Regions:
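PP2C/PPM-type serine/threonine phosphatase catalytic domain
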Residues: 1-252
Length: 252
């Protein structure tokens, strides 16, 4: 059976006084989440914290199934909806944080060679395989909609003044639409979850190069954050890295 190991890091970056990102990694390394909050100095951090706490509570109350793909997809939907409810309700109850919201990307690892990804907003999931990066998620953002429509190139999107304007997030509506992606993985693959602070600075190929050279999830996370900081890090940056290894090695 395929094994895996994981690590996570977060940093406020070079230009932000407060870190509005949050992440979660369950003790059994089966549930992972990254959330990137928005809504002012207090609201953004609170929104992302509420989101990951709701996902953590879902794991505690009802851990995800380990083999049934449909049931895992349903579990992610329930967890993300619970996170949306938490942010939405807090914003309704507290005028000081009204309008706050957060992105989220969630991954649930099944037994063996399968992981399910769910996301809302522009936090991302990558599959890195054989030295090549594959973006698994489609950003819910104005600029990426323009890229998909052929109105902007990826290079133009990187410098577009509206690149941080998202079209979907947790907490802005009572109900939220969740995109999900099933991913079959194999030994030597990596899954990387991140807030948009990472790809704002590092290109996909640079992310893949770090993963290929560093080898251990904690070292990979440290190096990705370091290179982002070296590149100016205008935003908070958060990374979760999951490494898949042969069954005779590793921790899971």
């Amino acid at each position: 059976m395929l094994k895996w190991r994981a690590a996570a890091r977060t940093d406020a970056g070079c230009q932000r006084q407060r870190n509005e990102d949050n992440y979660y990694m369950s003790p059994d390394q089966r549930v992972f989440a990254v959330a990137d909050g928005m809504g002012g100095a207090v609201g953004g951090a609170k929104a992302s914290k509420l989101a990951v706490e709701a996902i953590e509570q879902q794991w505690k109350d009802n851990p995800p199934p380990q083999t049934d793909r449909d049931a895992i997809e349903k579990w992610i939907a329930e967890a993300v909806n619970s996170a949306n409810d938490a942010v939405w309700q807090e914003a309704e109850d507290d005028a000081a944080v009204r309008g706050m919201g957060t992105t989220v990307v969630v991954a649930v690892q099944a037994d063996g060679d399968f992981i399910q990804i769910g996301h809302v907003g522009d936090s991302r999931a990558y599959l890195l395989r054989d030295g090549k990066p594959m973006l698994l998620t489609n950003d819910h953002s104005v600029v990426q909609e323009m890229v998909r429509a052929g109105r902007l190139t990826e290079e133009q999107a990187r410098i577009n003044p509206y690149k941080n304007l998202i079209t979907r997030c947790l907490g802005h509506e009572e109900k939220v639409e969740i995109d999900q992606i099933p991913v079959d993985v194999k030994a030597h693959d990596w899954i990387v979850l991140c807030s948009d602070g990472l790809p704002t600075v590092l290109r996909d190929e640079q992310i893949c190069e770090v993963v290929s050279k560093k080898g251990e999830p904690d070292v990979v996370c440290d190096e990705l954050v370091k290179q982002t900081l070296d590149g100016g890090a205008p935003d908070n940056v958060t990374v979760v890295a999951i490494q898949y290894i042969d069954s005779d090695n590793g921790s899971k």
